[in-house]
Amino acid sequence: MKNSRPVLFAVALASLLLLAVALYLQHVENMLPCPLCVIQRYAFAAIALICLVTAFRTEVTARIGAALAALASLAGAGVAGWHIYIKAHPTVSCGIDPLETSLNTIPTAKLLPFLLQADGLCTTEYAPIMGLSIPQWALVWFIVIALFLLHTAFRKKS
């Protein structure tokens, strides 16, 4: 039987590294996160948490965890896709005002404001990183992570 634990640890590590990159961009490069960015951060955090918790359980639980984390990744991909659409159509609003958002009143945002507080606007343009915008990179990573997790969750037992 193949072990899901290495994949879950790798995905958790990748998700935590992506959150670290987000913190670097926010605090060093002064790229303020918008509400959609923060929702994507929640998705990466959920993926990491689910993977870490279920990696220490039985193989069946690890596979269930991989499926749940894949759902979180697909949800994050949906948010990233919406964010890309908004950036491509500046007249469209994300519908979330960062100054009045209930997103900033969630207990985790109060506990970790340096990571989960939305201060920027969804349509703010920042310089691309290696040719892609931040939401485009997030979408790429959400898809890659989802593919690994779906393969782990649904592969045949050997």
UniProtKB/Swiss-Prot annotation:
Cytoplasmic topological domain: 1-7, 58-63, 156-158
Membrane topology classification: Multi-pass membrane protein
Secretion signal span: none
Cellular compartments per GO CC: plasma membrane
Periplasmic compartment segments: 25-42, 82-136
Gene behind the chain: dsbB
InterPro entries recorded: DiS_bond_form_DsbB/BdbC (IPR003752), Disulphide_bond_form_DsbB (IPR022920), DsbB (IPR050183), DsbB-like_sf (IPR023380)
Cystine connections: C34-C37, C94-C122
Task of the protein: Required for disulfide bond formation in some periplasmic proteins. Acts by oxidizing the DsbA protein.
Residues spanning the membrane: 8-24, 43-57, 64-81, 137-155
Protein's name in the database: Disulfide bond formation protein B
One GO BP: protein folding
Domain of life: Bacteria
Keyword DNA repair recorded: no
UniProt keywords, alphabetically: Cell inner membrane, Cell membrane, Chaperone, Disulfide bond, Electron transport, Membrane, Oxidoreductase, Redox-active center, Transmembrane, Transmembrane helix, Transport
MF-aspect GO terms: electron transfer activity; protein-disulfide reductase activity
Keyword presence, Transmembrane: yes
Compartments where found: Cell inner membrane
Similarity field: Belongs to the DsbB family.
Species of origin: Herminiimonas arsenicoxydans
